[in-house]
Amino acid sequence: MARIIALDGAQGEGGGQILRSALSLSMITGQPFEMSDIRAGRAKPGLLRQHLTAVRAATEICGAQVNGDELGSQQLRFTPGPIRGGEYRFAIGSAGSCMLVLQTVLPALWFADGSSRVEVHGGTHNQAAPSADFICRVWEPLLARMGISQRTTLIKHGFYPAGGGAAATVVEPATSLRGLTLISRGETLRTTAEALLAAVPYHVGEREVATLEAHFPLAEKNVVALEGGCGPGNALLLMIQSEQLTELFAAFGVKGTSAEAVANQVAHEARRYLASPAAVGEHLADQLILPLALAGEGAFTVARASAHLLTNIAVVERFLPVRFSCEATESGYLVRVSD
C-alpha cells in the first residue's frame, strides 16, 4: 500500500488551496493523504460547501475511499483509485466557486482513460476565486501551449450571494506535457474592459468603464446587462494582452461601494502589474505551479512571492519528485521547476 502523506492544513497561508492541490495530486499520483486543521487560517475553518463539493467530485472521479467529508470537518483522509473519464455534474448548493471545483479535478482528468465533460453549478464570479473569464481567457490558453486540450464554457453567470451559475469543461487526456517559460511578457498589445451587470442599473457599468478609461487607453469596452435572473451582481474585468500572455484583473461591486471605487481597485492592481517587468501576475502564478510541476520543467517571473504561492509549492513537492526554486531578482522573483 502506498505511503500516506500527512499534511497540515494550517501550514503557510492555511487556506483551501492546500486541500485542492492535495486532492489533485493524490488522484494523479495514486498516493493517499490525510490532512488535519483544514483551512485553519480562515475565519470559518473546516470544509465549506465549495470544498466539500471538490472532495466529493474528486471521490467520484477516481472512486476514492474518503473519511471526514462533511461540512465543517477539519480532518480528511483520502485514498484514491484509478482516474475515470466520463460525464460528471456537481452542484455546490451555494455561491461557492465553480472554478475552484473545476481546478481541483481537471488536472487529474488530463491523465484519465478517455474524454471527459465536467459541469459544476454554483458561483462563477467570486471575490476570492478566479472568475470564469480568467479560466477561459488567461489560464486555458497557457495550458494549450503545454499540450493540454481543455475548454471551459460559461453556461450561466452566478454572483455572490445568490449563486445560481454554471460552467462546463470538456477535457481530453494529454499525451505529454511541455514546460512553459514566461520570463518577459513583451509589449502590451491590447487592453479591453468589460462590465457585467445582473439586476444592477446600466449606468453603474458605464461609470466603471469610464473610470477605467481615465487610467488606460482601451481598445474595446463593453457594458453587458445579463438576463435570466442571475443577479444581483456586478463584475468589472480588465484584460491586458501582451506578446507572451494575457492577464485579467477583476473587482466586484458590493452594496455601499461606488462604481468608481470598483474601477479604481481594478486600475490599482493592473498598474501594479504593469509597473513590474515580471511576466506573470500574483494570482496567475498560483495557477501555474501544478501544471508546471506535472510537466517537470518551466519557469516564470512574478513581482511578489506570496504566501499562497509558497504554500502551494510546498504541497506539490510532497507528492511529486520535482523541486522549485524561488530566486529574488532586482524586479521580483524567478520561479523555476526541475525534476
Curated annotation (Swiss-Prot):
Pfam families reported for this sequence: RTC (PF01137), RTC_insert (PF05189)
Top-level taxon of the source organism: Bacteria
GO CC terms: cytoplasm
Catalytic activity: a 3'-end 3'-phospho-ribonucleotide-RNA + ATP = a 3'-end 2',3'-cyclophospho-ribonucleotide-RNA + AMP + diphosphate
Coiled-coil ranges from the UniProt annotation: none
Residues the entry annotates as binding ATP: 103, 283-287
An annotated GO BP: RNA processing
A molecular function (GO) term: RNA-3'-phosphate cyclase activity
Principal location listed in the UniProt entry: cytoplasm
Cell compartments where the protein resides: Cytoplasm
Task performed by this protein: Catalyzes the conversion of 3'-phosphate to a 2',3'-cyclic phosphodiester at the end of RNA. The mechanism of action of the enzyme occurs in 3 steps: (A) adenylation of the enzyme by ATP; (B) transfer of adenylate to an RNA-N3'P to produce RNA-N3'PP5'A; (C) and attack of the adjacent 2'-hydroxyl on the 3'-phosphorus in the diester linkage to produce the cyclic end product. The biological role of this enzyme is unknown but it is likely to function in some aspects of cellular RNA processing.
Homology family: Belongs to the RNA 3'-terminal cyclase family. Type 1 subfamily.
Record protein name field: RNA 3'-terminal phosphate cyclase
Organism (species): Salmonella enteritidis PT4 (strain P125109)
Gene responsible for this protein: rtcA
